[in-house]
């Protein structure tokens, strides 16, 4: 079952024209009504969590395919489209771009009360929203900074997240989709339908290959704080060699095409080092950091150590735990204790629709065709003018 997906595309800085946004709101209202009437509110939320479906919906509402603005404008248009009709339609949309994303918990609480959900369910929705944002900003450190977070949920408590990060260096944006169904483990491969137009190296703590690193990271904060601080100092004492210039006394214990795990031994201590090629850390700064210089990190680690989280998800959920904390623990687990993390991009395949820049890339053609065919059928049922309806269906080209 689809749980989470990622889409990567060009980063736009322009503003959506007022006339286009108003048009998208109008069409979005009609399309939302048709989808919910045809499939129900739970299915509407599920389809929002599908990157291909979401992209197709943006096309129906007359927005460019391959542009970051589709995410922010489409979610804003849908939110405006159902305003005042949430209870009747059975769906609720919270959050948005920038500062609006910070209002997500407040809006979940407000709409949850209107939907007459239990306080326990509302708290669960707020937790899922917060954790989805934390996972994609702290566990998937792919060079994209989250700046947009939108949370969808139904009258029955089914939820989806559509959030977006930007990479200004590469002038690209990446969209992350989450769906509640079967997302039982939020920190181990919570993604299935992943779409991207390129690979980006970085720390991927959601990969199953990072499961042992997660385990050791948790054990580090469950143990002695002083021992953890000594481990961090040990990292700065022995800089990691990326060019394979091993000194006397270093021996290779295992290797892969990308990396070599080595150990240094002396009378008092043993240190496991990782020799990594530039491929692994082309854009990832983790090896260049001296974690002993951050008083804030030491403070967070002390507070986490006092709590002693039971598992990695609880560790991530704690206040103050962010990308730097995750990196520090991951590198300690990897270098000193030999628990190698994954540095592979979670994106696995991509789809092509030309967009405004007409750049082709691989496509999941069967899924795309099925989505467009369904969208055409739904568009034919929209209560809009004949001319407008023709324009909508003309944009859906198989």
Features from the language model and the residues they span:
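Structure-specific DNA junction-binding interface
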Residues: 1-284
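Active-site-proximal structural scaffolding
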Residues: 50, 144, 293-297, 308, ...
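Short coil/turn segments at secondary-structure boundaries
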Residues: 69-74, 344-346, 387-392
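Helix-hairpin-helix
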Residues: 287-294, 311-331
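Extended, structured, electrostatic nucleic-acid-contact surfaces
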Residues: 299-319, 335
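Phosphate-backbone recognition surface of nucleic-acid-processing proteins
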Residues: 327-383
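Intrinsically disordered, low-complexity, charge-dense segments enriched in Lys/Arg
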Residues: 375-398
